């Protein structure tokens, strides 16, 4: 769970980070775990939320696409005495593991975990020499595949949209020139090039490579698409009165969650660019404020919490209107399948 741009620097720069569940008190207050309830933790990670939910008396189904997290969580499974199922799966596929309308609550903690950042061989950090990988699972296209094979125009879009990198064009063209001489293989290869092309200024709070590495990670793991589809899946498997709680650390992720809850509130009214939306019954009603940020005290103790935002909703009995990814206005980027070669 990396933090937002300047606030992300400590994790994105690769410094050791002890896993502390972000906004744990707020998550539990919104989720309301209790004996007899079944809660799904869609992003198990180091198990911080799962542990607290179990302590509250609820049973837990936990998912993670990272096999390393699944292996590390086995002692917790053993200690839970049958109250915890830990499944190797993307959270967008959660409906494959639970019956429709069968859950009392779902929590998502979006982003990369501190465990992944700390392992140089995973290739998430540019301050640790490792393979240019960034995959949350062992399968699929790596960051090296993207950097070495994508068209310059595609790299510009990836860096510009997913990383909000203002120097996307300059960096992409430098990558094209460098890879013609030798392919990028390590995190240092790429980080050093970016730092040469866009040197760090004294006023800069983050390393010049932060946004590009962020963009590559989001792209390689299709994090925005995964989140959007996970929200739709959550809507199908929550029972009436069930609660969906989502913690995000980046404006792109938060925008998707905000859009989803607005669309499902039955109050979405279109915009100057889109026609008015036909009114329909709400499938979610808000829990408390539309958005809750981490407290100043928590942010001072845990830098990862500085950009955290929590949004939550309660499932109504209304039928799901179905999956329509167009509501999120996601960009058209290069195909991961094509880059796999």
From Swiss-Prot:
**Which keywords are on file for this protein?**
Cytoplasm, Methyltransferase, rRNA processing, S-adenosyl-L-methionine, Transferase
- Gene Ontology cellular component annotations, sorted alphabetically: cytoplasm
Which BP terms does GO give this entry?
A: rRNA base methylation
Cite the InterPro entries for this sequence: RsmH, SAM-dep_MeTrfase_MraW_recog, SAM-dependent_MTases_sf
| Superkingdom, natural source | Bacteria
Q: Segment Disordered: which positions?
A: 292-318
Q: Does the keyword Coiled coil apply?
A: no
- Task of the protein: Specifically methylates the N4 position of cytidine in position 1402 (C1402) of 16S rRNA.
Among HAMAP family, the record links this protein to: 16SrRNA_methyltr_H
What is this protein's record name? Ribosomal RNA small subunit methyltransferase H
Q: Which species is this UniProt entry from?
A: Sinorhizobium fredii (strain NBRC 101917 / NGR234)
Q: Which gene encodes it?
A: rsmH
């Amino acid at each position: 769970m990396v933090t937002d741009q300047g606030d992300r620097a400590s994790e994105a720069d690769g410094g050791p980070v002890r896993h502390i569940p972000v906004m744990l008190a707020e998550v539990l207050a919104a989720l309301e775990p209790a004996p007899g309830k079944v809660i799904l933790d869609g992003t198990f990670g180091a198990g911080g939320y799962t542990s607290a939910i179990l302590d509250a008396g609820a049973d837990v189904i936990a998912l993670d696409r990272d096999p390393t997290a699944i292996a590390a969580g086995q002692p917790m499974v053993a200690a839970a005495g049958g109250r915890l199922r830990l499944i190797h799966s993307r959270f967008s596929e959660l409906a494959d593991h639970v019956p429709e309308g069968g859950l009392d609550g779902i929590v998502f903690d979006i982003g990369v975990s501190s465990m992944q950042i700390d392992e140089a061989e995973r290739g998430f950090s540019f301050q640790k020499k490792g393979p240019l990988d960034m995959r949350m699972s062992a399968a699929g296209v790596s960051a090296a595949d993207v950097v070495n094979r994508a068209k310059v125009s595609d790299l510009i879009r990836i860096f510009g949209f997913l990383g909000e990198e203002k120097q996307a064009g300059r960096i992409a063209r430098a990558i094209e020139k460098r890879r013609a001489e030798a392919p990028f293989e390590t995190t240092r290869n790429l980080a050093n090039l970016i730092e040469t092309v866009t040197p760090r200024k004294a006023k800069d709070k983050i390393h010049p490579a932060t946004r590009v590495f962020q963009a590559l990670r989001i792209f390689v793991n299709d994090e925005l698409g995964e989140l959007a589809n996970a929200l739709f899946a959550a809507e199908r498997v929550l029972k009436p009165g069930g609660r969906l709680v989502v913690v995000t650390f980046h404006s792109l992720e938060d925008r998707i969650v905000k859009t989803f809850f607005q669309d499902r509130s039955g109050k979405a009214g279109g915009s100057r660019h889109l026609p008015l939306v036909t009114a329909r019954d709400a499938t979610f009603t808000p829990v408390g404020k539309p958005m809750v940020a981490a407290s100043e005290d928590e942010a001072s103790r845990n830098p990862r919490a500085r950009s955290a935002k929590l949004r939550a909703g309660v499932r109504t009995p209304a039928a799901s209107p179905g999956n329509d990814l167009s509501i999120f206005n996601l960009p058209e980027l290069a195909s991961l399948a094509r880059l796999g070669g």
